[in-house]
């Protein structure tokens, strides 16, 4: 049977939505019989934007906005075709960005 190593990277602006998605991926993988490493928490990235409230005067009056990006990594060290099919049929919310990286194709 061909086994592969799979890395699933999740990104979202909402940490609760991200944690629910990671939990559903982990439960689906464990039901299929996979060994799961993670979720591994990455530091959140905060982008800050500072703009003037007025269009051309009053430099002291400013408004601050920020975007927080949360990231998680889930690793499946030995995934086979049944696990991949189970993960493909999983429905995730629209606010979560998913990147899947498949490594290897060794005979195990």
Swiss-Prot record:
Origin superkingdom: Bacteria
An example Gene Ontology CC term for this record: ribonucleoprotein complex
Keyword Ribosomal protein: yes
Database matches in Pfam families: Ribosomal_S10 (PF00338)
Ribosomal protein in keyword set: yes
Gene Ontology molecular function, alphabetical: structural constituent of ribosome; tRNA binding
GO biological process terms held by the UniProt record: translation
Keywords for the protein's UniProt record, in alphabetical order: Ribonucleoprotein, Ribosomal protein
Subunit structure: Part of the 30S ribosomal subunit.
Similarity annotation: Belongs to the universal ribosomal protein uS10 family.
Function: Involved in the binding of tRNA to the ribosomes.
Annotated protein name in UniProt: Small ribosomal subunit protein uS10
Lineage of source species: Bacteria, Pseudomonadati, Pseudomonadota, Alphaproteobacteria, Rickettsiales
Gene name in the database record: rpsJ
């Amino acid at each position: 049977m061909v086994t592969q190593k799979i890395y699933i990277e999740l990104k979202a602006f909402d940490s609760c939505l991200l944690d629910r998605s990671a939990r559903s991926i982990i439960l689906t993988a464990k039901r299929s019989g996979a060994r799961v490493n993670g979720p591994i928490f990455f530091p959140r990235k905060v982008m800050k934007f500072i703009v003037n409230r007025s269009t051309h005067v009053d430099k002291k009056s400013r408004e601050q906005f920020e975007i927080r990006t949360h990231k998680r990594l889930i690793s499946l060290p030995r995934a086979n075709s049944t696990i991949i099919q189970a993960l493909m049929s999983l429905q995730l919310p629209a606010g979560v960005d998913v990147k899947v990286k498949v490594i290897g194709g060794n005979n195990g």
